[in-house]
Amino acid sequence: VLMLLALLVGCATSRPPQRYAWVTGLKADKAERYEYLHAHVWPDVNQMIKQCHIQNFSIHECNINGQLYLFAYLEYTGTNFDADMNKMAADPTTKNWWKQTDPCQTPLPDAAAKGKIWSDTKEVYFLP
């Protein structure tokens, strides 16, 4: 048993998670609804997020000159981000969740041009 444990520990790769962040607008008249939904996230939505190798997921709200924005951050620990995101997008509960949350959001022009809600960001600094 000790030998097997040593082999498992030796074979385990300890790669750091990949960090992702996005930004989108939040409709002022839907902000309360959006906050309510996220204060009461459906358990199956959280479970799917975890099944897709996502950890430390957070969404922050910011008011800039009267316009509301959402900033989302997550860490991905899997090996195929696109496949996991496709898995999440195909999940019926997640689709229904997005039908609730998407109308609260206002995509920025770059995301809207691609038919997306969230705009990609580029990491410019990280302190481990």
What label would you give each PLM region?
Residues 30-55:
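Short amphipathic alpha-helical segments
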Residues 17-19, 37, 71:
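Short catalytic/metal-binding and nucleic-acid-binding patches
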Residues 67-74:
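A generic structural motif
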Residues 60-64:
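Short beta-strand micro-motifs enriched in acidic
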Residues 1-8:
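Sec-dependent N-terminal signal peptides
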Residues 48-55, 75-119:
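An amphipathic, aromatic/His-enriched active-site/gating alpha helix that lines ligand/cofactor pockets
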Residues 19-25:
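Active-site-flanking beta-strand signature of metal-NTP-handling nucleotidyl enzymes
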